[in-house]
Amino acid sequence: MEASDQSQAKLTLSFGGIQHAFSVPIEDLSALQDQKDAFLRSRSQASLSETREPCSPAELMLDYLEFLSCRNLPPPLTKPVLLAFSRNFLHNTEIHSLLAKPEYTPQTRRRLVRTYYMAALSAAESHVKESALLDAARQGNFQLAAVFGGQSTANPACVRELAELFAAYTPFLGDLISTAAPTLSALCRLPETKEHFCGRHIDIETWLHDPASIPDGDFIATAPVSCPVVGLLNLAHYAVTCHVLGKTPGELRSHLQGVTGHSQGIVAAVAISLSDSWESFYEAARMTVETLFWIGFECHQRSPRTSVSLDQVQDSLQNGHGRPSCMLSIVGLSRAHIQDILLKLNRSLPEDEQVYLALDNARDSFVVAGPSCSLVHLHTYLRSLKADASIDQTRIPHSLRKPTVQHQFLPISVPFHTPYLQEAARAIKERLFPWRVVSGKLTIPVYDNRTGNDLRKSDNVNLIHTMVDSICWEPCSWPAALGIENISHIVAFGSGGVGELAMRLKDGQGVRVIIGSEFQSRDEEIGTKADLFSPTLLASSTIVGSWGERFRPRLSKSPTGEVKIETKLSRLLDTPPLMVAGMTPTTAAWDFVSAITNAGYHVELAGGGYYDMDAMAVAVKKLVASIPPGRGITCNVIYASPQTLSGQVTLLRRLSSQGLPIDGLTIGAGIPSLEVVSEYIQALGLRHISLKPGSITAIREVIEIAKAHPDFPIILQWTGGRGGGHHSFEDFHAPILRTYGALRRCSNIILVAGSGFGGSEDTYPYLSGTWSAQYGLPAMPFDGILLGSRIMVAKEAHTSPAAKRLITEASGVSDSDWEKTYQEATGGVITVVSEMGQPIHKIATRGVLFWAEMDKTIFSLPRTKRVPELLKRRDYIIKRLNADFAKPWFGQNSKGEPVDLSEMTYIEVLRRLVALMYVSHQSRWIDPSYMTLLMDVSVRILERFSIVDELDDALVLREPHRFVENIVRLCPPAAHDILSPEDVAWFLLRCKARGQKPVNFIPALDDDFETFFKKDSLWQSEDVDALIDQDAGRCCILHGPVAAQYSQDRDEPAKEILDGITQSWIDMIRHDFYPGGVTPSSDSGSLSSESWSVLTPDLTSRDESALLDIIPEMQAYCPSISSLGRSGSPWIHALLSDEFILQGRDRRPNPCRRVFHFGPGGSLQFDRAKSEITVSMENHAGNRSVMRIVCENGADISVDLQQPSAYTDEMVSLPLKFQYDPGMVPVGISEVMEGRNERIKSFYSKVWFGEDICRGMNARSVFHGSEMALTEAMHRDLLSTVSLAYPHSETALSGVDVFPISVGMFPVWDAMARPLVVNDIDGDLLRLVHESNTFEYCEASTPLRVGDVVSSTAAVRAVYIEDAGKHVVVEASIERSGKPVMKVVSTFLFKGVFNDWNSTFKTNKEPELVLDVQSDLDELVLRDREWLLLHDPSQSLVGCSLLFRLETQVTWKNRNTYRSLDVSGLVFLQQASDDLKEIGAVAFHAGECVGNPVLSFLQRKGSPATSPTPLTSPGWPGVSSLEVQLPTSNEMYTRTSRDYNPIHVSPLFSQWADLPGTITQGMYTSAISAAVLEHLALNGDRRRFRRFSARFTDMVLPGDRLLVNVKHVGSIQGRMLFNVSAFKQATNNMVLEAEAELEQPPTAFFFTGQGSQKPNMGMDLYNSSPVAKAIWDEADKYIFETYGWSILDIVKNNPKTLTIHFRGKHGRKIRANYLSMENKTVTPDGQIVKKPILPGLTDQTQSYTFTEPSGLLFFSTFAQPSIVVMEKATFEDMRSKGLIPQSAVFAGHSLGEYGALLAFSGFMSVRNLVDLVFYRGLSMQFAMERDERGETNFGMVAASPQRVGKSDAVFTESHLRSLVQMISIASHELLEMVNLNIENEQYVCAGTDTETQLLLEEMSTTEDRTTTKLYKLILKSIPATKKLPMPIRLQRGRCTIPIPGIDVPFHSSYLRSTVSSYRKILQQYISEEDVHLERLVGRWIPNVTAKPFMADEGYVREVFNITQSPILKEMLEL
């Protein structure tokens, strides 16, 4: 019933996260609802130990059903729930299949099965479903046999197993138990038996109903108990099967072709054959248990009784071998081996203690029986015989290994199947006299477990006797019992692993084993209860073909009539199943690999022959270019060489990404981890991977890898130990015999045999599988054969003729003798140990025999003992090296005598290098790196002897002997001076340099001797000319000892060798498998990595329905696909199913195939008449893209992709052309490349710009964008589009009219994208990637705002080629009002492989570089550069800092070489004022060259002019990350940005471009990320955003969630430097990384004046900052040289006195400097008087002393320069760290104004400013009249009006001004307010000491603010103040603070007379050209005006009004 039925209602169960609703009748709903509530309450209240959480809705419902059943409710209430359960969960299955899932525990399964069947029987509902397995048997499709188990390791648990079975199937077993239990109970209570049982009776019913009462396992395991119980258990399983299937025992039996049993299982087998009804079954059951009872009892009583010591028992138990018993299982030895052991053992035993081979279970599995004491002896012997599990035997030759044996005592109390029980058998027969079974009563065959004969044909009148004998004393042969012919399935009943025993025997014979007593199986090919009961045929129930049938080779005929061999390997590779292995050096030669490939065979390029990745890349590319288009290549790499492997895998990944067909990777010398293999599979785009295991353990590792990648082909190449080259110690056959079944269970493993092969006769048995017959096993075919050594003598092989002769002279050996090579040369081959420490087979040449000798005598020693032994045998070893080995001893003097390296002269070294590395008679170097070695040694020699000369590279290449003689001429001492120890060490180190070919000599007998001896030892076999005397007997030649017997012909082409073998195979296959001579036709084609696993070996033609399997999900919404699949057109088949197409020689994924995988929203139409396919797809916005495919002639395919235009109502078409060629394999479709990229560019031009390509434009053109108004709508659209990604849209919105910096792309897009479609930049726009984007505001420009009208231009700055493809860099400029406002730079990448170097160029404005010329040598080196053109060559540059502003223009010839190089630019002198003075130019031009010598020099000698300063602790104090989510469509950004690239909006185009979806524009991701930075770091103030440079690192799709992180990482040029990164949250992959520059918040810099000084100021920075230290040191040096004192001493120590001495030349110069400093004063009569600035100083003064009680740092003369220098040092340190914003405003307080101007405007040098302020300090200090104490009676005090009087009264600036004026007027002395610092808070007053003291007193005491009273108080106080003793020491008051160290009334009218003279001093120091108005205007805030400085008349007038300056008056013409 359906839930919609009005008579039904929903009932919902919900518990523990599981919920299920089902329908019940309405009338039962209320009652069931109540029961449900009670059920859920009971579950909630139950403890965890009482109940289990349901794991599925089915379990929850069965739990509910169990609850209902336990409450004894009437069946009508339970039945609706049962029916609902069956309806919902058992519609197409049954209960066992449902519960077979691994989430159910065995206990849960039993409980749920019991619940189900109890409920079904209670409700009288049928539970029976027709078994699909039995139905197939009934129809004759399957042939079933049943087997029953016997005694086993499960004996102790047999009763418990029976109890568990009874608990699950109680309703089905009641009758059987009630039949058997009383029988057994009575038998064990008989007088003759009760003494044995002694009250422990066999009480089955008690045990079943109360499992806790079951006795211990030892008792149960005894034969009297276990024998009948095991028999009962067998019958119980059979009975359950009958009941579940609803059949009688006879009906089930009728489906069986026969039965048998293992040991005592034969009794159950006979019982089944006798049973045709339930009555006869129960009668047979009674007979079975009684027979087995007496067998167990009598055998137990009559077994030999022996004792085993307690120690022996404990030893056996502790080692996991079980308790010693009468039967011992042995696995791992052959029958003959065991019989031999038993024969020897029994000779030492008395007759009554001998042991016998009791059971033969399998080829290497047996059971020996006898007295336990004797079996303990056997057990002990086996332990000594077998291999220790902890010892690795993989490096021991197979024949010398100890066998791997498993032996276990069985819990069986009697020695069944031995003569010891013959008497027992007679007694048993007497006991069973009433029972009689004659053969005629057997209704189906019962197969004797001794002979395999059908017992129906037995001559024995009573089969009871036959069974007794077969169990008691006759040996059991399980192989004979299972030798049942013509069966497809074996159903096993019972425990003890009888099913696994059957599987072990029948594996590979085409027999499926089903264990009818288990829910689960450890082997996926073994069926279970589910297979037995399922109403549908399960995969594990089907017929499984024999290995011989499934994997044998087949023949097929191609459409051309060619007969081909088909195996799994041939289908995968589309080649014959004969391949050539990767061999170094043989298949390292690309041309040889090409020859084999072009012959039609698979071969591996040997990566082991390449140490240089560039050379390997060249080889791969040449190989690809030389083989048929589309044919893939496979590279062989060596896992044991990790560094080389890493480089080669990286290279192959790069080449694969470029489209080169890297189909396969073969990994030798080790099995990588699963993770590594997975990475290779994913990263390299492989179609298959080959692994070469060397042991059983390694084979199992490969199996695990294959299981982890079940859909990916894994080729397992097995070579064993007999292979040529590196090999294992394994026997060839044994490991495969043990693992073949496991290998074939992995359908994706392709098994290839290699080693020892050379012809068709020796290889065919392995291809057909008959090789295994000699081991008594079923056929075990390999999928392919691997040839290696045999191919080394092929005509095309590079093996030298002399080496080929040595190969053919080697006789080789048979498979049985190859292990002798470990000890000696055998068949001309010997094993040595390679550099990797692995055994390796080589032809036994003199050199290799010496190698073997060294392995035994030297390399076998511990490493610490090797060198002493080498030195001990030095002369012998050197002699052998020089006489016999490929690598001679290097040391040799000019007389030809062997010497050590340290005894050679430098020239002898050079001559020896040339002699060994240069093949003189062929005028060639062995390797280019050897030439480099000679050059390096030569340079070292010249350096050693200080010779400066250029070496002639060309001469080294052409005539190295002349080159060496030139060295002798240049450096005569080198001919007789021996090498210094340093040069000896250097030479040895240089010989080991990475990246060069290993040296071909032995330079020393040291720790590296083995490396020098063994490394790179194989190449000479292909270059005998490079050997001394061209002696091939010196070299190493890889070859296999077995294969050597086939290597005879030295002139046979590889194709003939391979074709000969293949053709012979075809003849043999036809003879063996096609007796009729008919060969089926085939067009099955090649096997792809996706579809190969569904193809069976029987496939001989392409199944059209397989096409639909490729895209099954489409049929639901696209019925047209069915008609397309049935079209029968080969070209359509290819479009749908071919994995790749060809583009030229590059293989690309088939785009049509991808497009056909469209989802909902797509449609397909097929017009058969027109041969036209139309696919249409709609995107989120409802826009539809179309693909139209037409092929009228079956060969020429036209594909038209159509996209809606943004400019018109018409579609824009992209026409693409393809050709189909069925004869081109494995890739049948190729794209027509002529004009392709031009057609794509035309399409994009129309999509992007609404017009076709402008033919007049090229890559060097300037592209103009249209003028654009930045409107409010544009502003709103951009912000709205970006805000879509934010969790709260207001995050990205802002009320200001400033555009985000990302708007820069909008005005320039038109101009920037147009270069991408010009014809001279070749590339596929469908593969275009936007790599990076940079937006940068121009200096001093303001951000773009609403209302701006802008224009743009763009130009291509670079077109260059890298591994990833062709990069195009476009730079655009945005102008506003004719001025540049922003620069936008984008880098685009055309993915692919390009060689059009003529189109490449790059124009680059280099970062500015600064070069400090610090010495004469620096200047000399610089002037020597020809490219430097100085305007004034006579000008000295020492001490100068030069700034280089350069532009580089290059074109390329190839990846590493420029075709042309031009460097031009200007050179500037950096002046102290930060001004730049042009002093020269750079002009450099070169043709073909490598590198940029100009930049190389400047980068090496100089440094960047600006560089970022990193933060020590990067981060951000606030929120530093934000999660965003991309909109589900890119439509809105596409419209806003006008980037109409269809890959962003069209599913059809994105699929065609092989993208995972409509990828989001990088510009959009960039805009979002920039907005996040605005939000988090700028609080939305985007005016401070100056630069954003983003690189796009991964694709982003609509809907992706990104986490955007921001980090403050440093500063640059006053801006904050941020890193921004965005990560996909789902994968944690970075999708964007960016760098941003933000202006700091508006900042003002304030410089303090005098009074701020303190000791040690700036010294911390002096000690930590090189920049600050340099300024202090410069000032200190200058002051000391000029004025005789140290500013550092003043600051650090603050001395109270300082004496400057004027003695000596330097002293006199200092005195003259002081004398030149004068003060000019005006006398009362108007005369100008000049006085020395230091009072009393004359030209005779010998010294002068300065004194200050507070310390000279508080003396104006020293304080002022100290403060200014400190400020300058601090500022420059900040500037060097990029902390000074370029727009910052600045001001200085009093003296600080000098520091501010010096820092920001650079209006004079530090030296000049020191002069100026020192003069200022002196002039002010000594302009005052002083008394005899040096006092001036003047001071300055800071006053705070706010602190005056009571808090409720107000004392303001005006009050203070009035007070100061009143004091001055009243006293007639100076007191003025001179500094207005903080309004109403701080002012500074200057005046006489008495006036300032009076001010202090009045401000501290006054309460009355009235002028009259205040004036009176002042008048009253003056007399007392004037009477104070002098000098007056001002004290700090409540409102005033005296300024210490200042006794000059600065800024007061008292000093007005000094202004004129000081103005003149300033005019001397400040030159007009040093004043930069742009640094001052708007930024400098002068003291005088307290307003930003402006250079206009109004500002000048304002200053004049304040200062009355005559200069300004003149300027204003007043």
Curated annotation (Swiss-Prot):
Pathway: Secondary metabolite biosynthesis. SUPFAM superfamilies: FabD/lysophospholipase-like, Inosine monophosphate dehydrogenase (IMPDH), Thioesterase/thiol ester dehydrase-isomerase. Transmembrane segments: none annotated. Residues 570-815 are annotated as: Enoyl reductase (ER) domain. Residues 1645-2005 are annotated as: Malonyl/palmitoyl transferase (MT/PT) domain. It catalyses: acetyl-CoA + n malonyl-CoA + 2n NADPH + 4n H(+) = a long-chain-acyl-CoA + n CoA + n CO2 + 2n NADP(+); holo-[ACP] + acetyl-CoA = acetyl-[ACP] + CoA; holo-[ACP] + malonyl-CoA = malonyl-[ACP] + CoA; a (3R)-hydroxyacyl-[ACP] = a (2E)-enoyl-[ACP] + H2O. Belongs to the fungal fatty acid synthetase subunit beta family. Residues 144-515 are annotated as: Acetyltransferase (AT) domain. Induction: Expression does not seem to be regulated by the azaphilone pigments (MonAzPs) gene cluster-specific transcription regulator pigB. The lineage of its organism: Eukaryota, Fungi, Dikarya, Ascomycota, Pezizomycotina. One of its GO terms (molecular function) is pigment binding. One of its GO terms (cellular component) is fatty acid synthase complex. Residues 1126-1606 are annotated as: Dehydratase (DH) domain. PANTHER family: FATTY ACID SYNTHASE SUBUNIT BETA, MALONYL COA-ACYL CARRIER PROTEIN TRANSACYLASE. [Alpha(6)beta(6)] hexamers of two multifunctional subunits (alpha and beta). This is Fatty acid synthase beta subunit pigK. Residues 1514-1627 form the MaoC-like domain. Fatty acid synthase subunit beta; part of the gene cluster that mediates the biosynthesis of azaphilone pigments (MonAzPs), a complex mixture of compounds with a common azaphilone skeleton very widely used as food colorants. PigJ and pigK form the two subunits of a dedicated fungal fatty acid synthase (FAS) that produces the side chain fatty acyl moiety of MonAzPs, a beta-keto fatty acid. The chain length control of the pigJ-pigK FAS is somewhat flexible as MonAzPs features either a beta-ketooctanoic or a beta-ketodecanoic acid moiety. Disruption phenotype: Leads to the accumulation of pyran intermediates devoid of the medium-chain fatty acyl moiety such as monascusone A. It holds the Pfam family FAS1_DH_region. It comes from Monascus ruber (Mold). The active site is at S263, S1790.
